[in-house]
């Protein structure tokens, strides 16, 4: 009996207090990314208003004054919805000319989950697509009316699913794309390693 008691005492004495501790969960962090980029000619012939969903779920608007508009927002909350639409309105003073019109709209996110998993995903228009040629005010107006909308919901698990976001006046008939090209383009803008795509 004395030998059994000493064995139990020795085994418990060798045990570390760290054996019973579990690693505390990491704090969840989500970074939302939005990018709108237009060709030089777009700003010559149109006004661009960027509509997006912020980290609280509220819809926001900002006037685009340069070729590239970028927004990065931080939140700790999932699920969330991201939405982006560049409302492109032709100027009343458009004259005939040789215009090369292009808009890139991309939305993405990086989720660092409490379980340590990191997910990077994004949707948008093809950044490699060729510009559209327009010569008349009517052709410019027709192009402006086709500005694509990006929309998706990110689940509590960190995965995205496409959805429609109504900004009033936008159409969601143009499908979003996701692929390594969009992901790599987004990574390069925000300084992330494109190998994550």
Across the structure, where does each feature detected by a protein language model lie?
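Extended, low-complexity, turn-rich repeat/linker tracts enriched in Gly/Pro/Ser/Thr and Asp/Glu
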Residues: 39-43, 92-101
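Noncatalytic modules at the cell exterior or secretory-pathway interfaces
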Residues: 27-38, 79-88
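Short, ordered, surface-exposed loop/turn motifs in non-cytosolic proteins
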Residues: 41-55
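Exposed low-complexity, polar/acidic, P/S/T/G-rich flexible segments that act as propeptides
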Residues: 97-113
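Bacterial Sec-dependent N-terminal signal peptides
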Residues: 7-33, 194
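C-terminal partner/receptor-binding element of secreted or periplasmic proteins
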Residues: 120-197
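Tryptophan-paired
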Residues: 54-90
């Amino acid at each position: 009996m004395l030998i059994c008691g000493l064995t139990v005492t020795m085994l418990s004495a060798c045990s570390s207090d760290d054996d019973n501790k579990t690693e505390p969960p990491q704090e969840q962090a989500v970074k939302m990314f939005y990018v709108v980029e237009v060709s030089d000619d777009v700003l010559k012939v149109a006004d661009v208003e960027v509509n997006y969903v912020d980290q609280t779920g509220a819809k926001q608007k900002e006037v685009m004054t340069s070729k590239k508009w970028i927004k990065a927002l931080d939140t700790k909350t999932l699920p969330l919805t991201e939405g982006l639409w560049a409302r492109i309105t032709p100027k009343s003073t458009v004259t005939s000319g040789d215009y090369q019109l292009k808009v890139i709209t991309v939305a993405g996110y990086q989720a660092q989950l409490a379980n340590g998993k990191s997910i990077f995903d994004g949707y948008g228009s093809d950044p490699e697509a060729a510009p559209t040629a327009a010569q008349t005010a009517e052709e410019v107006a027709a192009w402006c009316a086709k500005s694509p909308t990006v929309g998706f919901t990110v689940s509590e698990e960190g995965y995205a699913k496409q959805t429609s976001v109504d900004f009033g006046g936008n159409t969601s008939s143009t499908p979003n794309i996701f692929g390594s090209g969009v992901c790599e383009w987004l990574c390069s803008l925000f300084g992330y390693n494109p190998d994550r795509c």
